[in-house]
Amino acid sequence: MQLKIIDQSGCLYLKVQAERIDAAAAIQFKDLMRRALTPSLQQKIIDLEQINFIDSTGLGALISLQKAQQNAAKLTTCSLHPQVAKVFKLTRMDEVFDIYATAEAALKAASAAPAFKADED
C-alpha cells in the first residue's frame, strides 16, 4: 500500500494506492494516513478510487483518523468504487464523511469552502 500526497492550494490531497483496506491492510493504512494527516485547519481529501474492497477494520481506521483530527477540518472522501460506496451507505458512513464523485469535484468544493476556524478559548 502506498499513499500519494499532494498539497494543492491549501488542500491536502491523499490518493490511496491499493485495492483493499481490510484486516490485513488496515494497520498499515492507518499508519500511513496518521503520518500524513497532522491535525491542522487544512482541508483534507482522501481519494479511494483504487480501493475496490473495504471491511469493518478499514471503516474503523477511517473513523479513527477522523476523530484524531479533533477540531481540525473534516476529512472528505472521493472517487468511491461502487462496492465501497455501497458499504459506506449501508453503514451510514456517507453521513460521517463528505463524499464526492470525483477528485476534481472534491478539490473544487474544498477551494470554494470558507476557511475553517477553530473555536477560540
Regions found by a protein language model. Give the residues of each.
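Short beta-strands and strand-loop turn motifs
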Residues: 14-15, 47
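Amphipathic alpha-helical interaction surfaces in cytosolic regulatory modules
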Residues: 20-97
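A charged, well-structured terminal subsegment
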Residues: 101-121
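General small-molecule cofactor/ligand-binding pocket signal
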Residues: 4-6, 78, 100
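Short beta-strand/loop segment at the start of cytosolic alpha/beta domains
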Residues: 1-14
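Conserved catalytic submotifs in the C-terminal HATPase_c
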Residues: 8-9, 49, 104
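Beta-strand-connecting loop/turn residues
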Residues: 10-11, 19, 102
